[in-house]
Amino acid sequence: MKHTPLFNVALTGLLSAIALTACGGSDEAPVAAPVVAVAAAVFPPVPTLIAHRGASALRPEHTLAAYTQAIDDGADIIEPDLVATKDGFLVARHENAIAILNADGSIRESTTDIATRPEIASLLTTKVIDGTSIRGWLTEDMTLAQLKTMRAVERIPAIRPGNVPFNGEFQVPTLQEVIDLAKSKAIEKGRTIGVYPETKHPTYFKSIGLPLERRLIDVLAANGWNSKEAPVFIQSFEVGNLKEMRGMTTARIVQLLSSAGRPFDFVAAGPSETRSYADLVTPAGLREVATYANGIGPSKDMVIPVVSGALGTPTALVANAKAANLITHIYTLRPENAFLPTNLKRAPATDNTLRGESVTEIQTFLQAGVDGFFTDESAVGRAAIRTFVKK
């Protein structure tokens, strides 16, 4: 498997507006535009800098502003998590629950201002998502037109107070809008910009009649991106839907991995399926992953665990993945104290909002041989790559 192919990318212009009518239950169609050639280049470059939900340390996550900032700061690829609306559009949100309430009715977490919009607030509901009961507002209960009336807000304001002034400024983008932005910025920058979509809760969405897989592949195909040469990586924490999409596309696929727990489709399969993520990262498990995927996306602690507050000795995962012909893209390298090992925090370590020694953390993982990484601040990631010296 060659994960850095050489190819010319034909890029179309940015759409100025979106259609609000779903066609065949998929995302809106791109508009034809003059073709602009970008010089042949190896894509993606290694190490690969992947903007986790955009520049989410600097702008509210999963907004065009966050993706734009990330590209301007040097990201090779932007990542939209994908959920479906009632009328079948794919939109970029970390969860289908765009606001979650506590038992007392207060907001536990929110990525939109829906709670302040009485005309839509009546859609409040309680559902079980992947075995967890959630009370809040969910994308599958509203149309794209309804979702477009809302505005994004910062998900973790206590850690990212600098993003709060941007609350209420940006819409929730569709997958098509994210692709349009990537193509437009590629023309502007003269380099390929990739997209790294994640299907969120695919078993759940299939159970309610809104399967994500065909919708995603149809949008990629409509953009000329349903091929192994396309600047696309498709990812999921589940297994079955990645295998299903392998039958629909030759685009690159990445199996996401967690240091604990099980893929939810394994859980949903019942007692006949007993495997966990731990089984997928054995040498035999990785060889099976390689039958449908081009790479793995493990949590960073699966590559280098934290021991006594500091990064410890790398595990064998990267080497074992390479032996199975799989690339490794780790998640998530974030700049704030809240997410760093104790020895890399900036004093006072108790202030979770402060930026710590994130460059050092990133370079430690590069030294361990990862092929790429997800980061919340692309400028920091680019600085780490630029100054990295392999030992």
Regions found by a protein language model. Name each.
Residues 2-10:
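Bacterial N-terminal signal peptides that target proteins for export
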Residues 17-20:
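Bacterial Sec-type N-terminal signal peptides, specifically the leucine/valine-rich hydrophobic h-region
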Residues 23-391:
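Phosphate-group recognition and catalysis centered on beta-loop-alpha active-site segments
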